[in-house]
């Protein structure tokens, strides 16, 4: 049974897309954080000093890419599950990622938050586009 509202938006697709986005961000983000922590500790940085080293662009840009990749995955999942209006479903997943991102990224630099907000919607839409059947693209 496909759960939809009167406009044809699949709630199931959106929920699964958001779960894929959040889950992907968490899994890859945690792995990235562990690798960074190990590298920093082996370079002699004390564990209590690690957080001060995490706000440099060299560290944060991969975080943006991880987030955009996870949102692309979420948009793809939403589009595939919905089987119609794939780009719209991907856009909704991306749009829902904006407030979720502020909950997680509130302590990051302003430039990071601006780029994150600007890129998350297109990433979700791109995932939805990739979910479209090839003959429809």
Model segments located where?
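Juxtamembrane/disordered regions of integral membrane proteins
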Residues: 2-137
């Amino acid at each position: 049974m496909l759960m939809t509202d009167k406009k044809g938006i699949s709630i199931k697709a959106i929920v699964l897309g958001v779960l894929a986005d959040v889950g992907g961000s968490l899994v890859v983000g945690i792995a990235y954080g562990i690798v960074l922590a190990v590298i920093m500790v082996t370079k002699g940085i004390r564990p209590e000093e690690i957080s001060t080293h995490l706000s440099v662009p060299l560290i944060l840009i991969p975080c943006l890419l991880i987030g955009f990749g996870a949102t692309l995955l979420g948009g793809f999942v939403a589009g595939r599950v919905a089987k119609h209006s794939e780009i719209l479903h991907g856009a909704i997943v991306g749009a829902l990622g904006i407030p979720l991102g502020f909950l997680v990224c509130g302590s990051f630099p302003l430039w990071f938050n601006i780029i994150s907000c600007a890129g998350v919607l297109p990433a979700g839409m791109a995932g939805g586009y990739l979910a479209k059947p090839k003959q429809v693209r």
